Amino acid sequence: MCQCSSLKPGPHGAPRSEYWIGLHVLVQTKQAAEVLEREIPGFAAAGINVIIAEVDYNYEFEAHPELRGRDPISKEQVERLVRLCRKHQVKLIPQFQALGHQSWAKSTFPLLTQYPQFDETPGLYPHNDGIYCRSWCPLHPEVNPIVFQLCDELLEAFEAKALHVGMDEVLLIGENSCPRCKGKNRAELFAKAIKDFHEHLVKKRGVEMLMWGDRLLDSASIGYAGWEAADNGTAPAIDMIPKDIIICDWHYGKRDDYPSIPLFLEKGFRVLPTSWRDAEAAAALVDFSLKFGSDKRMLGHLCTLWRAPKDGESAENPAIRIATQRLKNPQ
């Protein structure tokens, strides 16, 4: 497939008060929630106005307590985070990692531990040897009713108007070992999973839906290597899914251009370009995205930690400083 955009960059847009200046953090233990609580005032003072808290299974779920992580954050902790974010005018968005990333290293996460029949590769890869991460089967009729209950609990606890559903790096999909998915089109399977969540979150619950964008990009045509784009057939899903989803378009290396930003914009999506720990790469991504700043669907910037926050983080993180300075004062 060809993923080419005719949308051309222009001069940096004027400063916009509504730019999202976001931070993605892992909040998967009680201690992580405590640190985030201490850091919220500092993050807000540094310019952060959106925090995406990746919780996944690490909340004291009531509907399915068997799916709680080892040290889940409590409802009371979430209530304090909500109050603090509201006080400091920070939008707090929970994240629940859907479809892929159902394991890490040798640890399989609660859903596939408690319900192994949901696994896309049932009975294969003992100790997760030989794979990156497990996935659940997008066609299993019993998986969505369970995970949607978890999403609903997070939305209610966080009093959230949006949910990030992850869906990055889904490498196991349409596998021959799955009796339901074998032989089926992987883009259609991926699109179905996305549309199922969209139906529940956006249409039924009336909240915004965010997701990572890498599996919607075709590595052969767009020029991204490695993890930033897909080579397993999921990319055509970009034309099969609702365009009111917010795409978090992550790129962690320095480049002259980032063609996925105009591609997603031209397709009709709102885009939140996303960086990690390389300050020069973050600056390059922010600067390139600002060439499309006159389009309000280019929402701003998201800085990721891919770990729990640390005390003093708000004063020390260079990517946060770069994003704040450039988005508030585009040159």
Where do the language-model regions lie?
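Glycine-rich, aromatic-flanked loop segments that form ligand/cofactor-binding clefts
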Residues: E18-G22, G42-V55, V82-L124
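Hydrophobic faces of well-ordered beta-strands that scaffold small-molecule active sites
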Residues: Y19-V25, I51-A53, L92-F96, L163-V165, ...
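The substrate-binding groove and active-site-proximal loops of carbohydrate-active enzymes
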Residues: I21-Q31, A63-K75, N128-P145, P179-L189, ...
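Short, acidic/polar
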Residues: T29-A44, Q149-L150, R255-I261, A282-F288
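Aromatic-lined carbohydrate-binding/catalytic grooves of carbohydrate-active enzymes
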Residues: A44-Q77
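Active-site-adjacent "subsite" loops/lids of carbohydrate-active enzymes
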Residues: L99-E153, P273
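Active-site neighborhood of glycoside hydrolase catalytic domains
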Residues: P141-F269, E280
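Substrate-binding cleft of secreted/luminal carbohydrate-active enzymes
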Residues: L272-Q331
